[in-house]
Amino acid sequence: MILVTGATGFLGAEVAKELVLRGNTIRCTKRASSKFPAILQPYAAQIDWVIADLMNEDSLIDALDGVTQVYNCAAFVSLKAADKEPMIRTNVKGTATLVDLCNDRGIRMVHTSSVAAVGEAPAGEQITEKHHLDPTTETDGYAISKLESEMEVWRGIAEGLDAVIVNPTIIIGASAGTAGSGQIFDTVRNGLKYYTRGTIGFVDVQDVAKCMIALMETDISGERYIINGGNRAYKQLFEEIANCMHVKAPAKLAKPWMMEVAWRGAAFWGMLTGSAPAIDKTSARAASVTRNFDNSKIKKAIGFEFRPVSDTIKEICQSA
């Protein structure tokens, strides 16, 4: 039996769908309050849904009954300052519990981390799996939670766990809707006026799912892989989206000081309204930083060729 945690989320649902399309009958976890993803509705007969929470060990024990493979896609994600410590605690403790249970039962795991947990490369070089985030200087709650969760998997591997780790860049796809990375497309459609100088990696959600499944089917263990379809300057990305949506592309450069003003304003508004800020300190500053990711390790490991980012952008725009 194959288990997918976090299957109601953007990536988890795609992993579940890909597994079903390959002829598998799978088990997926969901919290009691979570809704079934629309993309999985046609495959209800092939999916055994169970109520489970990574913070509830007993529910995980039941979910893991008869399981031989786990795709761990579950994570608590929030930009709210008040959620920073709970997010770190939840993601790390939940991962640690799952790691221990899988290790005890001889279950193979593919763990979803993030490039947020990967460090910086020297100027002019691409970021690889050999770079590591410095926990003594990092302040972003999400990055810390991903780094410390990944460290729990490395602990498990040292204790005998059969596992690999994937570090996706920004995952995009039509099924995101207007949530998560879908906000980028929604913002451009509604009339984005400014762009930043930064560069970041993007990858199709289907490619991430396919890479995870391909890795699961190998005998590779104790490795991490950056999953990146291509690097894009934000200006280029916004222009591609705008052209696809037949709207005006942003033409004004948002300088770093302007981004500082933006995140502070968003934080103040979020404090007044109790809502998540549209942009936080970390993402505001990252928007002006050049981060290019090297995907050669995963391509070599499984012989994978990524879908062009431009093709995914077109698909998302056509579905909007």
Predicted segments, located by residue:
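Substrate-positioning beta->alpha
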Residues: E148, A179-G180, T196-M216, E223
